[in-house]
Amino acid sequence: MREILGRRRRLLSRRRNDGRPELLGAALTVATEWQWPVLPGVAPDPQGRARCGCPDPECTVPGAHPFDPGLLAATTDARMVRWWWTNRPSAPIILATGGGAPCAVSLPALAASRALALLDRRSMRLGPVIASPTRWALLVKPYSLEQLGELLYAKDFVPGSLRFHGEGGYVALPPSETGSGAVRWERPPLPGSAAPWVPDVEAVVDAVVDALTRTGVSAPEM
């Protein structure tokens, strides 16, 4: 009997240790202090991290998207967030963009690194920037589809690899682990309980497109 109880304790301990308590803490900060709605993402396939744990064998964002629950379940409720990450302690943190939460503009990592270096030299103020091994995302104020359409229409050229994460979209937040690798803050939010400051989408798109043009990032790199 003691042997059975000891074995059960070891199994329970192993399950708890397999989780990452910093994910729960980060999810609670985002949801309750910043009031940004989050939900757990589908994790990468444990048999191969480049593959997704969802049923789609050709998933293009492995381990970096919502699946069950769906995106509409995103919430700022502390009890729900705690329940999710207690039961799925290694799940990526997915931010539902738009509405009362920030939106995002993302671009390939190499191009983003060059663009941010130029914007730094210009002393442009940026909000938080999320980095994965393949793409970086600049958080911006919420925008409407109409606003985005007018902004892009006014441009002579917009790199095709720019992605816009608005209402109904999502991004993975640090310290998530996805199929492409670790998600981290390239520009972390300033410490404090208030929601992080984010710039207008117009300022970011104008600056990023101009920076990419001036740094000579070619279409294949984008």
What are these regions (language model features)?
Residues 1-135, 139-222:
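Conserved phosphate/metal-binding and DNA-contacting active-site motifs used
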